[in-house]
UniProtKB/Swiss-Prot annotation:
Dimethylates the guanine residues at position 26 and 27 of one or more tRNAs using S-adenosyl-L-methionine as donor of the methyl groups. Changing I85A: Slightly decreased tRNA guanine-dimethyltransferase activity. Changing H110A: Decreased tRNA guanine-dimethyltransferase activity. Changing H219A: Strongly decreased tRNA guanine-dimethyltransferase activity. One of its GO terms (molecular function) is tRNA binding. It is an enzyme of class 2 (transferase). The lineage of its organism: Bacteria, Pseudomonadati, Aquificota, Aquificia, Aquificales. Coiled coil: none annotated. PROSITE patterns: SAM_MT_TRM1. It catalyses: guanosine(26)/guanosine(27) in tRNA + 4 S-adenosyl-L-methionine = N(2)-dimethylguanosine(26)/N(2)-dimethylguanosine(27) in tRNA + 4 S-adenosyl-L-homocysteine + 4 H(+). Its EC number is 2.1.1.215. Residues 2-375 form the Trm1 methyltransferase domain. This is tRNA (guanine(26)-N(2)/guanine(27)-N(2))-dimethyltransferase.
Length: 392
């Protein structure tokens, strides 16, 4: 056992292995620090929004680090409910709550199966649920949606990025009933498929799970949703389901909402058009929520520098919410550009914004044809420059 510090919290954890697996009885993954930073900031947003004490749930708690940080680092938690089916996890959680001197009336520790914990004990009672399963969150979504109060927030993590991003398309179809696209913006496609699934599962109960933030990092996706009720709100979300048609030859892409408007061939090069979806084609970021996360993170010393850097990038990205983005190196390779310009220059050239998904990725409102035309223009300018340089 060893003691580690994260944020303000200190916790006892088993010795951290090089490889994390679901077979471990209790684990603490230091690589998920940014994820937990975001969960704390998301809860603080809810504190400010509601202006009252809140109840939070961590149904797959493991070491208890999330629930402990929620109690120590936010301003409104009345009580945190930490749950894990592992008896070893329960022992470690108890030690960790004591280690941080948290009063016993501010938390409860339970050892139930996560769905049972969410449904049986506190139906419609939680203001904030942080769900961080090992793998897909699908088996827990309905229980989470039913356990939350109206206006509550779900902080959701998914680590099964391989199926969602196209490595295992059949698995993606079974779990999410959608086709992934293994292209340069495959992780965004995966996030949009996951959002669609969350909305779909909650919609069965006339619950609207409205996406307000999306983030892709390392091996996981991080999403936030606000819970609302009413068939009109649910229908409005479902209206924002659609498909992406993509050409793997020329990188052309089109968003389609009408099944009758599918194209078999790419109108740009004539190659086969592939289909991704159904998926969410609406906004990935609520500007108010995203701006709050960024601004709150800058004020806090306990928040990682990496978290602050990522939030700055996402804050800028949220100003231009396209479906899909372009990767400069892929475009440069396609048109045989003599020299790839720095991404900061390319962003200005395309009137776009950088994306957090890929280091040299950018979003733009320009059409695919306009993007390729500007790439050809850039190519000609570079050729002229190199020719002049050659001539002295």
């Amino acid at each position: 056992m060893e003691i580690v510090q994260e944020g303000i919290a200190k916790i006892i954890v088993p010795e951290i292995p090089k490889t994390v697996s679901s077979d471990m009885p209790v684990f603490y993954n230091p690589r998920m620090r940014v994820n937990r930073d975001l969960a704390v900031l998301g809860l603080e947003y809810l504190c400010k929004k509601l202006g009252r004490p809140v109840k939070v749930a961590d149904p797959l708690s493991a070491s208890g680090i999330r629930a402990i940080r929620f109690l120590l680092e936010t301003s409104c938690v009345e009580k945190a409910y930490a749950n894990d089916i592992s008896s070893k996890a329960i022992e470690i959680m108890k030690e960790n709550f004591k280690l941080n001197n948290i009063p016993e009336d501010r938390y409860e520790i339970h050892g139930m199966e996560a769905n049972f914990f969410l449904r049986k004990e506190w139906g419609f009672g939680f203001d904030y649920v942080d769900l961080d399963p090992f793998g897909t969150p699908v088996p827990f979504i309905e229980s989470v949606a039913l356990s939350m109060k109206r206006g509550g927030i779900l902080s959701l993590t998914a680590t099964d990025t391989a199926p969602l991003s196209g490595t295992y398309p059949k698995t993606c179809m079974r779990r999410y009933m959608a086709r992934p696209l293994r292209n340069e913006f495959k992780h965004e496609v995966g996030i949009r498929i996951l959002i669609k699934k969350v909305i779909e599962l909650a919609a069965q109960y006339d619950i609207a799970m409205i996406p307000i933030f999306a983030y892709s990092h390392l091996h996981y996706f991080k999403l936030f949703f606000v819970k609302e009720r009413g068939v009109e709100k649910v229908d409005k979300l479902i209206e924002q389901f659609g498909y992406i048609q993509y050409c793997f030859n020329c990188m052309n892409r089109e968003v389609v909402t009408d099944l009758y408007k599918f194209k078999e061939k790419c109108p740009h090069c004539g190659s086969k058009f592939h289909i991704g979806g159904p998926l969410w084609i609406g906004k990935l970021w609520d500007e108010e929520f995203t701006n709050f996360l960024y601004e709150e993170a800058q004020k806090r010393e306990e928040i990682e520098k990496e978290t602050k850097r990522i939030l700055k990038l996402i804050k800028e990205e949220s100003q231009l919410q396209t479906v899909g983005f372009y990767v400069l190196s892929k475009l440069a390779e396609k048109v045989k550009l003599p020299a790839q310009p720095p991404i900061r220059i390319a962003v200005k050239f395309f009137n776009g914004v950088r994306t957090h998904f890929v280091g040299d990725g950018f979003r733009t409102n320009l059409s695919f044809e306009e993007v390729m035309k500007k790439m050809e223009e850039l190519k000609e300018k570079q050729k002229e420059f190199l020719e002049k340089k050659k001539q002295g």
